[in-house]
Design a protein with these regions (language model features):
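A conserved amphipathic terminal alpha-helix motif
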Residues: 91, 118-149
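Short beta-edge strand/loop motif at the mouth of beta-sheet-based domains
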Residues: 28-69
Length: 149
């Protein structure tokens, strides 16, 4: 099967934690596990990434020199089961109109976490060229998350 630059990226992992813990690690402890030096806007100048309330929740990356950029805004969530947000690190939501959705489902003694990164069909050709990098990058990011959970 040939993958086009507009298909939804879908990743699924199992974490050895309850859905509540898995959700909290992703949202409340993201600064502790996200590989900012490789997957961040500021790279080696990155200082932190955190969800914060800005008249609605947003995921914000900060650089050591005080600069900041919003990676995305939370559209909706259900604690311990679902998180959906816009996704546009280093760009405006208009430039990169993609979104991610994570679901957290109890699975035996752990949780199955599914990430879908969609909306590529609304993106410009320039943004679509980043899709392959995200497809590979989400594997590494989620493995780092799994190890932290």
């Amino acid at each position: 099967m040939t993958v086009t630059a507009t298909e939804t990226i879908r990743k699924e992992i199992f974490v050895d934690a309850s859905p509540e813990t898995a959700f909290r690690v992703f949202t409340e402890q993201i600064a502790e596990w996200w590989p900012l030096g490789k997957y961040g806007t500021f790279l080696e100048q990155a200082d932190s990434v955190v969800f914060e309330d800005r008249d609605g929740w947003a995921l914000v990356e900060r650089a050591k020199d005080g600069r900041e950029t919003v990676w995305g805004e939370v559209l909706d969530y259900e604690f311990s089961s679902r998180l959906r947000m816009t996704w546009h690190p280093g760009r405006s939501a208009d430039e990169m109109p993609t979104e991610i959705e994570l679901t957290f489902a109890a699975d035996g003694d752990g949780t199955t976490v599914v990430l879908e990164h969609r909306g590529w069909e609304r993106a410009s050709d320039e943004v679509r060229t980043a899709r392959a990098g995200y497809d590979a990058g989400w594997n590494e990011v989620l493995e780092t998350y799994r190890n932290a959970s």
